[in-house]
């Protein structure tokens, strides 16, 4: 609720709004997948502290709607639990904190080592990668990551 309120306030005021006074992060986007009724507020950083509260935006990757690959990681057992239910063609909507909306259909998925993802944030095109630990039912963190790949098809206000 605090993240939702901070995100809505950011859209209305045009200023980054922290969800609580001592927060070291703030909402930058909302992810929605209507087919499976999933949504999550994306936070400005991908630090361990930020990921405790929601998906993060990996520093040095572009924002959604910008050329390159925007990367959002989150925990598999909480905020990105729904990734296991995504299928090719599902539409991921990303609403940025400036109110712009971008649609990304899922192109596919992959499982990679955390240190060998193959993601080039400066690549051509307008892409989105959602990342979480793999396998989904593991009890501890391992070296593999589950990636959802998507390419932007539309942008709107």
Q: Model-found features: residue ranges?
A:
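Solvent-exposed, non-transmembrane regions of membrane-associated and secreted proteins
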Residues: 1-157
């Amino acid at each position: 609720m605090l993240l939702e309120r901070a995100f809505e306030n950011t859209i209305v005021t045009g200023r980054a709004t922290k969800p609580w006074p001592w927060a070291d992060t703030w909402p930058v986007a909302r992810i929605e997948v209507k087919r499976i009724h999933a949504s999550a507020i994306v936070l400005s950083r991908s630090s361990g502290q930020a990921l405790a509260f929601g998906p993060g935006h990996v520093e040095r990757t572009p924002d959604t709607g910008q050329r390159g690959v925007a990367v959002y990681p989150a925990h598999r057992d909480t905020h990105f639990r729904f990734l296991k239910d995504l299928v090719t063609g599902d539409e991921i909507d990303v609403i940025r904190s400036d109110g712009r909306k971008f649609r990304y259909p899922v192109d596919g998925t992959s499982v990679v080592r955390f240190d060998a993802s193959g993601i080039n944030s400066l690549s051509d095109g307008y892409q989105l990668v959602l990342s979480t630990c793999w396998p989904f039912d593991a009890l501890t963190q391992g070296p593999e990551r589950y990636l959802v790949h998507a390419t932007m098809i539309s942008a709107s206000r």
